């Protein structure tokens, strides 16, 4: 064994000796691999890093990215060949302690909130992966992404608002 601490060694010994705990660990590993696979296939909505996006490109995946101007909008779509869909939201994150990403409909009604997202205060943007599975099946629609700084008391300050005008181009249910 090459465990770093005595606690690690004790846990490892237990996992090898206890079939039930070993089986549970196997289930957790399978779950983690499944989540990683969904993320790599672009099927999850999550915050990602430039490094993650670069790795996907290096692996040969077709990554479609949209970066609407701060406070502005952008027309967007996906094709059958796209593997991953990334939104790049520029904002001054330097004074934020906590950031939430809200996805709203065209009437500014919040549909999804990713609370306390990972971010780098020195970065000039937050990158999020929209589910490519959803984007390929979605009807033409408008989504407004809002980055909010949230203080300790729960107060919110708008860091940026970005509008995505999605046009469906793939045939199927929901197509025009």
Predicted regions and their residues:
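Contiguous beta-strand segments within globular domains
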Residues: 68-95
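Charged, amphipathic alpha-helical segments
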Residues: 82-85, 127-133
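Solvent-exposed serine/threonine-rich low-complexity stretches and specific carbohydrate-binding patches
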Residues: 106-130
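Short alpha-helical interface segments
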Residues: 15-63
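Short, aromatic- and glycine-rich surface loops/edge beta-strands on solvent-exposed regions
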Residues: 99-102, 134-160
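Short, amphipathic alpha-helical interaction patch
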Residues: 1-17
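Short beta-strand elements
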Residues: 151-176
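Solvent-exposed loop/turn segments flanking beta-strands in beta-repeat/beta-sandwich domains
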Residues: 93-105
């Amino acid at each position: 064994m090459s465990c770093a601490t005595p606690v690690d060694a004790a846990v490892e010994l237990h996992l090898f000796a206890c079939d039930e705990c070993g089986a549970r660990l196997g289930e957790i590993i399978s779950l983690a691999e499944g989540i990683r696979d969904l993320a790599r296939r672009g099927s999850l909505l999550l915050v990602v890093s430039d490094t993650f996006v670069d790795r996907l490109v290096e692996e040969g995946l077709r990554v479609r990215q949209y970066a609407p101007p701060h406070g502005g909008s952008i027309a967007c779509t996906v094709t059958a060949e796209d593997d991953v869909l990334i939104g790049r939201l520029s904002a001054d994150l330097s004074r934020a302690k906590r950031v939430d990403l809200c996805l709203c409909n065209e009437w500014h009604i919040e549909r999804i909130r990713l609370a306390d997202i990972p971010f780098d205060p020195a970065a000039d943007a937050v990158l999020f992966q929209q589910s490519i599975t959803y984007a390929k099946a979605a009807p033409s629609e408008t989504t407004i992404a809002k980055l909010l700084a949230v203080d300790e008391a729960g107060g919110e300050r708008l860091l940026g608002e970005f509008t995505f005008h999605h046009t469906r181009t793939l045939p199927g249910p929901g197509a025009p």
